[in-house]
Amino acid sequence: MQRFIKWLAVITSLDLLIVLLGGALVTKTGSGQGCGKSWPLCNGEFVPSNLSMETIIELSHRLTSGSAGILVTLLCILSWKYYKHVRETKTLAILSFVFLVAQALMGAAAVVWGQMPAVLAIHFGISLISFASVILLTCLIFEIDQKFDARSLIMDKKMKFHIYGVTIYSYIVVYTGALVRHERASLACPDFPLCSKNRPMPTQLHEWVQMGHRVAAMLIFAWILYAMILAIRHYKQQPVVYWGWIISFILVTLQAIVGILVVFTNASLSMALLHSLFISCLFAVLCYLVMLGTRSKVNAKEAASISKQTK
């Protein structure tokens, strides 16, 4: 059964990643109304008779979201049953399921009633939490903690501050990026790093949305760089923290490069999807570090208790 659960966890993680990228594809191609205002039917039909490209994209996104719902539900039930001895299992299972349902309902509401771009931007963030929760659940199932000796990890307050701070802030950056997509502001500023050679400062809403995201992205790049330097200096003996921050910096660097290329490739589809891919992976890594941070306090108390007993 454990082998089956491992396969299920991997397939579920991949399916949720496809859901995230599919949502970005729907937004990028303007396929949100590919099935009209019908939900769960498509243009009022179970199998649509007229298949335009927008209909195929929207319908594919609905199908992958539906399969993800089934897989996540099954994974939550089995992990709850067979891995309940691991402290975070129940919490992650609940988060995975609740946020997947929330993003499905929000997607359905957007189709039937429509939503403002500021509200639609939350949709990606909700999906991202479900994806990260399933990734963490998968890590627990594969016992990644034991391989990195993460269960005995103790971090100082400074490192935990950076972990929690960067993760929360990354969610804000994700929202600003999703808002750029939904406001159709990807090409509002044709130059980089400033908005335009003729007008360095933004003058209208779409330009402010674009430049706001750029500033937020630059700040998270600098913050992760600083945290990585701290990890390299002080956590070489803790490989999970050491490599966690190095991987985070690699991902945020790739994210920044692709973000710049989005501007200079006229917002090409491949660059837009890579942009969504890298931020999804980065958020999952940061959430894993958050989980380690919550354990650190427990580990410190246990170490102090053992120390008192030995005295």
UniProtKB/Swiss-Prot annotation:
Q: Please list the disulfide bridges.
A: C35-C42, C189-C195
This one is known as: Heme A synthase
- Residues noted as binding heme b in the record, renumbered to the chain: H213, H275
- Domain remarks in the entry? The N-half (TM1-TM4) and C-half (TM5-TM8) domains are connected by an intracellular loop. Each domain is formed from four-helix bundles and they align in a pseudo twofold symmetry manner. The N-half domain is the substrate-heme O binding domain and the C-half domain is the cofactor heme B binding domain. The cysteines of disulfide bond Cys-35 and Cys-42 may be involved in transfer of reducing equivalents from quinol in the membrane to the active site of the enzyme.
Family, per the entry? Answer: Belongs to the COX15/CtaA family. Type 1 subfamily.
On subunit structure and binding partners, the annotation says:
Interacts with CtaB.
Provide the E.C. number(s) assigned to this enzyme: 1.17.99.9
TM spans, by residue?
Answer: 7-27, 63-83, 92-112, 122-142, 160-180, 212-232, 244-264, 272-292
UniProt cross-references to HAMAP family, sorted A to Z: HemeA_synth_type1 (MF_01664)
Report if keyword Lipid metabolism is assigned: no
Which Pfam family, an example, fits this chain?
A: COX15-CtaA
Q: Kindly list the places in or outside the cell where this protein is found, as annotated in its UniProt entry.
A: Cell membrane
Amino acids binding heme o = H61, H123
One CC-aspect GO term: plasma membrane
Query: PANTHER family per the record?
Result: HEME A SYNTHASE
Active site, renumbered: E58
Record topology, Cytoplasmic segments? 1-6, 84-91, 143-159, 233-243, 293-311
Which reactions does this protein catalyse?
A: Fe(II)-heme o + 2 A + H2O = Fe(II)-heme a + 2 AH2
Which cofactors are named for this entry?
heme b
| Ranges in the topological domain labelled Extracellular | 28-62, 113-121, 181-211, 265-271
Keywords in alphabetical order: Cell membrane, Disulfide bond, Heme biosynthesis, Iron, Membrane, Metal-binding, Oxidoreductase, Transmembrane, Transmembrane helix
What molecular function terms (GO) are annotated for this protein? metal ion binding; oxidoreductase activity, acting on NAD(P)H, heme protein as acceptor
Superkingdom: Bacteria
As for membrane topology, the entry says: Multi-pass membrane protein
Q: Which GO terms describe its biological process?
A: heme A biosynthetic process
What InterPro entries has UniProt attached to this entry? COX15/CtaA_fam, COX15/CtaA_HemeA_synthase, HemeA_Synthase_type1
